[in-house]
Amino acid sequence: MKFRRATKEDLSAIVQLLATDKLGQLREAYGDPLPEKYYETFYKIDEDPNQELIVLVSDMNEIIGTMQLTFIQYLTYQGGIRAQVEAVRIRDDHQSKGLGEKMMRWAIARAEERKAHLLQLTSDKQRPDAIRFYERLGFKASHEGMKMHLKN
């Protein structure tokens, strides 16, 4: 297995991973062909040096996991960098095999390579198993996060 940056050819498998998730079923539009908006967004992410869309590829060259890392420069922490990890998914038939932990350990190492002082994430409150998983890895619920859905 290996981690690598996603390519345009990976996009269908990535969106499928996002759409098969319990909450993703409500917000993603997986189909063949994929809606053009996914390609437009992929190109923006791919061109941004502070964004990394990552895939986990099996020995059989199948995409079995994905995540997105964003590196954010802040004035706080004396000009520190925060890494944000989002959209962490492992294909259903590969769950409970330690791959989620490998993926997060890889994300931690990548954040350290990029000189981030903090790796942060959010997990929906409807995912108690995921929250316990992140806590087991050392993440702390140190802040109360809030979101506002906008009309766009």
Q: Model-flagged regions — what are they?
A:
Residues 101, 113, 125-143, 148:
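Conserved active-site alpha-helix within GNAT-family acetyltransferase domains
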Residues 104, 111-123:
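Conserved GNAT acetyl-CoA-binding A-motif
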Residues 22-41:
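Conserved GNAT-fold acetyl-CoA-binding loop/helix
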Residues 55, 62-71, 89:
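Conserved beta-strand in the GNAT
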Residues 87-90, 96-109, 136:
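Conserved acetyl-CoA-binding loop-helix of GNAT-fold acetyltransferases
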Residues 2-16:
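A short beta-loop-alpha structural element at the N-terminal edge
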Residues 1, 61-66, 83:
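Glycine-rich phosphate/pyrophosphate-binding loop shared by adenosine-nucleotide-utilizing enzymes
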